[in-house]
Amino acid sequence: MIAEVPAVPAPPAPASAADVFGPARPTALAYAGILATRGVQRGLLGPREVPRLWDRHRLNCAVVAELIERRRGTLLDLGSGAGLPGLVLAMVLPDVTVTLLEPMERRCRFLTECVTELGLANVSVLRGRAEDVTLRTDVVTARAVAPLPRLAELALGVVRPGGMVLAIKGRTAAEELRAAGPVLRRIGARDAQVVRAGQGKVVPATTVVRFFAR
């Protein structure tokens, strides 16, 4: 077994973590430790990302919860990878049933270990691709999965009619949405817009492309 020693020490949680995670803060701390050790050792997180675990990866994802009005629905996280944003959202939305969809077996093993060790009873891990999934969910989330047109195609295949898709994007989100707008409308997306989550809590605020299924 590989010794769990981080390449770079995990940074302490910032004061804002208590506000963003609330009672889930201890779980968030434990997950940060897992990411800084096994996440790095297994290649799910680059060593240079460890100092930015909180601002770039954890808080950045957690604040997306404020965009999810239904607090007792279902959520599917596409291409979960190391669990961002799906695992983080499951912590702050304990009454939402979260499915982490990931095609790679080694990543699924990592996610399953995290779910078990963190005691997240509202999370299940599903190995597969969005094209092969038959379930329909209230919310779909994604981060760094695919360009927006392809992501929309995948997400609209698994979200229920009227359901919401939240794609965490970067600085070029507005330009990407403008370019993809005609495609999104053609394949059944509506009310697509760029929104900000976590304003006043994280700097910079998280940029999200949000749209709904017809």
Regions found by a protein language model. Name each.
Residues 32-37, 83-84, 124-125, 150-154:
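Short hydrophobic/aromatic-rich motifs at helix boundaries and adjacent loops
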